[in-house]
A protein has these predicted regions:
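Positively charged n-region of N-terminal signal peptides that target proteins for export
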Residues: 1-4, 19
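Sec-dependent N-terminal signal peptides
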Residues: 4-12
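C-terminal motif of bacterial Sec signal peptides marking the signal peptidase cleavage site
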Residues: 14-16
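Extracellular glycan-recognition regions
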Residues: 23-239
Length: 239
């Protein structure tokens, strides 16, 4: 009888230990896990804020088909608030890292069709970077930063025949850097910004949308997490 009681207590102890281990695994930080596993990203750790018309995952590629009249913008200049673009993100408390992704928008064909990277915290605090189709001559490579419910937009015109773009999103505490690349090797700075709501846990990932009456399929691939590629400033010291 005594031995049976001991065995029962051991079984209960092991079960409790296993439950704690499962809980620990479930709560593992997504970025820290990727950094510990040769930069590989488990696509199953991404979560939708809003789902697209269609989504398909094959290998390391995510195909996202947009719905018409989907967008992200808050107030500035246009005086409207659009907050219904599909956003697929993972969350992290890691304060120093970089996220890289390749986008393919060969199917974009209508004004304002776009896809790229995003850090969507809530409707009034987010950033994004993308190529936005304009016409058969050119499109906009740009970024939007929204702090406290007001968006800005910084762009440069690129040829309309550009159909792929790489992005690198880097975090250093509550400051952020967005870079772009034509080949995934040589990156150029697009934007440095501060996010007022971006000091703690954040969510970041990918998005695609079609603000007007159109739809297209965007492809996202070659995603990875690395140590922060945005190096600390080596000039004037902080105040």
């Amino acid at each position: 009888m005594k031995n049976l009681i001991i065995l029962a207590l051991v079984a209960i102890s092991l079960a409790a230990c296993n439950q704690k281990q499962v809980k620990k695994m479930e709560n593992t930080d997504n970025v820290q896990t990727a950094l510990a596993n040769d930069d590989r990203i488990d696509l199953g750790r991404f979560e939708w804020t809003r789902e697209p018309a269609e989504c398909e995952i094959k290998g390391d590629t995510i195909a996202v088909t947009t719905k018409p009249h989907t967008d992200l913008w808050q107030r500035t200049y246009y005086h409207f608030r659009n907050d219904n673009a599909p956003v697929l993100q993972m969350k992290t408390n890691e304060r120093f890292f970089s996220f890289v992704v390749k986008t393919d928008f060969s199917q974009s064909h209508h004004r304002f069709d776009q896809c790229g990277i995003v850090m969507y915290l809530d409707s009034e605090n987010w950033l994004k970077a993308s190529v936005e189709y304009e016409n058969e001559q050119f499109q906009h490579l740009g970024s939007v930063v929204t702090n406290g419910g007001y968006s800005d937009w910084a762009t440069t015109a690129i040829p309309a025949d550009v159909k792929t773009m790489w992005y690198r999103f880097s975090r250093r505490e509550d400051d952020y850097c967005i870079e772009c690349s034509a080949d995934g090797v040589h990156f150029s700075q697009m934007r440095i910004c501060h996010m007022h709501a971006g000091a703690g846990e954040i969510r970041f990932g990918i998005y695609a949308c079609s603000p007007e009456d159109s739809s297209f399929t965007a492809l996202f691939s070659d995603m990875k997490i690395t140590a922060c590629a945005w190096q600390a400033h080596d000039g004037q010291q902080p105040d």
